[in-house]
């Protein structure tokens, strides 16, 4: 039972954080989508949906294309282009680094 309370408090904390920072939620959403990690993508989208702001999160994912040094763009296309230019290993290293920098792991694990 204690575990359920800790998880619930963690989700509430993440939702409060998400409310304050849709750019981060959007970036995490895009990073997970680019890597094909749909379970974590759904977790991020679930938080946005629970807050009634899923569309804003999707828009933020596209606005957060600065991860690849671009103002706007499709995450999957950007990831593929980066992998073509620098190699798949480097692209994945950068994607994982960005996931860590944004604290995406906590959002993905919360649901």
Q: Model segments located where?
A:
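Sec-dependent signal peptide recognition
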Residues: 1-8
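Hydrophobic h-region of N-terminal signal peptides that target proteins for export
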Residues: 9-18
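Generic hydrophobic secondary-structure packing signal
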Residues: 14, 24-25, 44
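Immediate post-signal-peptide N-terminus of mature secreted/exported proteins
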Residues: 19-38
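Compact alpha-helical subdomains of small soluble proteins
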Residues: 45-111
């Amino acid at each position: 039972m204690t575990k359920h309370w800790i998880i619930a408090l963690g989700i509430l904390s993440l939702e409060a954080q998400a409310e304050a920072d849709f750019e981060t939620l959007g970036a995490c959403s895009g990073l997970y989508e680019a890597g094909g990690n749909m379970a974590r993508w759904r977790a991020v989208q679930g938080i946005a949906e629970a807050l009634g702001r899923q569309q804003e999160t999707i828009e933020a994912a596209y606005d957060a294309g600065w991860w690849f040094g671009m103002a706007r763009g499709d995450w999957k296309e950007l990831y593929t282009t980066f992998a073509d230019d620098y190699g798949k290993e480097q692209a994945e290293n950068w994607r994982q680094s960005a996931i860590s920098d944004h604290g995406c792991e906590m959002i993905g694990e919360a649901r």
